[in-house]
């Protein structure tokens, strides 16, 4: 008998599954006989329990298992014979109005994959960021690297790097060690008192009033001042209140930045300390970073453009699956941060509804585009990307071996290559506008994405 697939909506379908009772019963009997060979009951040796007693004990459980297996098998057969592209898992329910003597009847309700219509790529608009790495970017990077290697010396005490100047008072950039006592209405509060507290002036770690009070103090000097905590201060007990502080300076240390010389170059991995080589290597590294960031920005632009010109209905089942996947990813992230009981964190799936719908929709569009235009990743493309990624490491060959030793890592790189193929394909047809941006702006844009 032909299977009738009912259309319940844009993507929702229903089909009736009929299972002859004699076929089901035959399978139930076979499983109970097999079960009886090993079942244990008080008063009987293993395998010697009467079949009737085994059936009385386990018939309901075995029947449910057989029906579940048979329904799944029959649904698979129907979906193949009817060329149904089932999205997600079907739901099965007994058919209440079925007048089929000698048969079990179930309704299988499910969704199918949608037809994806991708519009004219020539109408897509993409802004492609470009950047140039010059001396200014190299100098800025060197300045950051020097600050990362800063070391401090007590003001006023001579040494191989000097004494920091005649002024021994605390200045912006100095590392200071202080004691402080804070009170509100004459009463000390939690977190308001500390000894040998260390911070760097000007880094913004402390509230502005506190830093202002510490500025200009010399070792041994103290200052009293009022400090009003912001209304949104993380310490709720003191938020919005004014405290009276006394800060005592115990040590003032000035920052000494290392000179850009051969020793500095060697600390960056330039074995012979050649400064020209150092700058060339920094330029190469910045170039790779700029390429990675521009690729990320343009990829997002291409994906947005594809969504704008594509038409499709999104299966709810796939959205729900992805929502649950995002919840699990969020819990894993919490666990990695050390949050207790992260695996059971009450994260509502609703908060990921919009993100999941976009991810599923984009996945369907990309799959259609890749299939229609042969944009699958080729082995040589994957190897080229792995080699490029490995260049930034000390032992590139080891990184390549590390990638090819794990199928999951390799699959992630394959997905990256497919996305790159899609981006290149779309850029070759879309309206592309190039925009020159500074490396700093590029870094800021990708950080906010």
Curated annotation (Swiss-Prot):
It is an enzyme of class 5 (isomerase). It comes from Burkholderia thailandensis (strain ATCC 700388 / DSM 13276 / CCUG 48851 / CIP 106301 / E264). This is Trigger factor. It catalyses: [protein]-peptidylproline (omega=180) = [protein]-peptidylproline (omega=0). It is found in: Cytoplasm. Consists of 3 domains; the N-terminus binds the ribosome, the middle domain has PPIase activity, while the C-terminus has intrinsic chaperone activity on its own. HAMAP family: Trigger_factor_Tig. Belongs to the FKBP-type PPIase family. Tig subfamily. Its EC number is 5.2.1.8. GO terms for molecular function: peptidyl-prolyl cis-trans isomerase activity; protein folding chaperone; ribosome binding. GO terms for biological process: 'de novo' cotranslational protein folding; cell division; chaperone-mediated protein folding; protein transport; protein unfolding. Involved in protein export. Acts as a chaperone by maintaining the newly synthesized protein in an open conformation. Functions as a peptidyl-prolyl cis-trans isomerase. One of its GO terms (cellular component) is cytoplasm. PROSITE patterns: FKBP_PPIASE. Keywords: Cell cycle, Cell division, Chaperone, Cytoplasm, Isomerase, Rotamase. The keyword Cytoplasm applies. NCBIfam families: tig (TIGR00115). It comes from the Bacteria. Its main location: cytoplasm. Residues 173-258 form the PPIase FKBP-type domain.
């Amino acid at each position: 008998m032909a299977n009738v697939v009912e259309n319940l909506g844009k993507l929702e379908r229903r089909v009736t599954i009929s299972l002859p009772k004699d076929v089901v019963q035959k399978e139930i009997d076979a499983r109970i006989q097999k079960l009886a060979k090993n079942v244990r009951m008080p008063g009987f040796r293993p395998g010697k329990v009467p079949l009737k007693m085994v059936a009385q004990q386990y018939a309901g459980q075995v029947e449910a298992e057989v029906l579940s297996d048979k329904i799944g098998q029959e649904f698979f057969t129907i979906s193949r014979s009817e060329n149904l592209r089932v999205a997600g898992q079907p739901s099965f329910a007994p058919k209440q109005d079925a007048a089929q003597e000698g048969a079990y009847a179930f309704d299988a309700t499910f969704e199918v994959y949608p037809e994806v219509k991708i519009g004219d790529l020539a109408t897509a608009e993409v802004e492609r960021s470009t950047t140039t790495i010059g001396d200014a970017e190299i100098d800025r990077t060197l300045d950051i690297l020097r600050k990362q290697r800063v070391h401090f010396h007590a003001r006023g005490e001579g040494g191989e790097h000097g004494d920091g100047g005649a002024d021994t008072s605390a200045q912006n950039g100095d590392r200071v060690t202080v004691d402080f006592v804070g009170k509100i209405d004459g009463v000390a509060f939690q977190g308001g008192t500390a000894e040998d507290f260390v911070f760097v002036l000007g880094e913004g770690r402390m509230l502005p009033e506190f830093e202002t009070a510490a500025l200009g103090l010399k070792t041994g000097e103290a200052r009293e001042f009022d400090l009003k905590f912001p209304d949104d201060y993380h310490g709720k007990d003191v938020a919005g209140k004014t405290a009276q502080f006394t800060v005592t300076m115990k040590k003032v240390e000035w920052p000494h930045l290392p000179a850009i010389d051969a020793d500095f170059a060697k600390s960056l991995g330039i074995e012979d300390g050649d400064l020209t080589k150092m700058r060339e290597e920094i330029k190469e590294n910045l170039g790779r970073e700029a390429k990675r960031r521009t690729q990320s920005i343009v990829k997002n632009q291409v994906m947005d453009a594809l969504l704008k010109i594509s038409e499709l209905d999104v299966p709810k089942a796939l959205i729900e699956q992805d929502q649950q996947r995002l919840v699990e990813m969020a819990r894993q992230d919490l666990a990695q941060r050390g949050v207790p009981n992260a695996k059971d964190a009450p994260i509502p799936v609703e908060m990921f509804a919009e993100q999941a719908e976009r991810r599923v929709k984009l996945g369907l569009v990309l799959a259609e585009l890749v299939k229609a235009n042969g944009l699958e990743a080729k082995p040589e493309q994957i190897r080229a990307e792995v080699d490029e990624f490995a260049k930034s490491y000390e032992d590139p060959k080891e990184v390549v071996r590390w990638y090819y030793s794990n199928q999951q890592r390799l699959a992630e790189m394959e997905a990256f290559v497919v996305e790159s193929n899609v981006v290149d394909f779309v850029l070759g047809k879309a309206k592309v506008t190039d925009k020159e941006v500074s490396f700093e702006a590029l870094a800021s844009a990708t950080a906010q994405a």
